[in-house]
Amino acid sequence: MPKVALYNQSGETIGEIELNDSVFGIEPNKHVLFEAVIMQRASLRQGTHKTKNRAEVSGGGRKPWRQKGTGRARQGSIRAPQWRGGGTVFGPVPRSYSYKLPKKVRRLAIKSALSSKVLENNIVVLDNLTLEAPKTKEMVKILNNLSVDRKALIVTDDVNENVTLSARNIPGVTVVTANGINVLDVLNHDKLVITKAAVEKVEEVLA
């Protein structure tokens, strides 16, 4: 089982914690990580694109000129696709791009993402993360104590309003709960700062 240092909020090492091998110690599967990121990014797309077809464009109800005798090509509507200002043929319509990967694949992806952070030595485990009041200054101080000066994902075991509000204005820092941890967030941040309680919760779900 991989062992990592356990820190307090002052940045002091207070011991070690053993991480579950089946969650934090597997060989990262790059292909599964790729598939999971594509799935998440697809679900973020708005899908609100829309063009009008000839039935939806205003006007064009009357035949522009008679069928025969003018020497011109026959036309039925000034809103046909070949006309300027006419409708679009097979244009985009609103749709959802989201789809689901199999549950086993999704679980393997998050395990691979977490294991990659352990392999890169980019995981920081805290014994506890508590703030008496929402203060950005205090959160910055804690991150500095832990030598976390880059993009960081903070994972708590449950919703912590003070932590969330304190980190909200720090560029590159995101706070999620153990239940809300996902592949895109883990890979999109350089450091993973996770509480001991959150580790236990993640292992309980994924092990």
Curated annotation (Swiss-Prot):
UniProt cross-references to InterPro entries, sorted A to Z: Ribosomal_uL4, Ribosomal_uL4-like, Ribosomal_uL4_dom_sf
Signal peptide: none
A molecular-function term among this protein's GO annotations: structural constituent of ribosome
Keywords, ordered alphabetically: Ribonucleoprotein, Ribosomal protein, RNA-binding, rRNA-binding
Single Gene Ontology BP annotation: translation
HAMAP family noted in UniProt: Ribosomal_uL4_B
Role noted for this protein: One of the primary rRNA binding proteins, this protein initially binds near the 5'-end of the 23S rRNA. It is important during the early stages of 50S assembly. It makes multiple contacts with different domains of the 23S rRNA in the assembled 50S subunit and ribosome. Forms part of the polypeptide exit tunnel.
Similarity comment text for this entry: Belongs to the universal ribosomal protein uL4 family.
Protein name (Swiss-Prot/TrEMBL): Large ribosomal subunit protein uL4
Organism: Geobacillus sp. (strain WCH70)
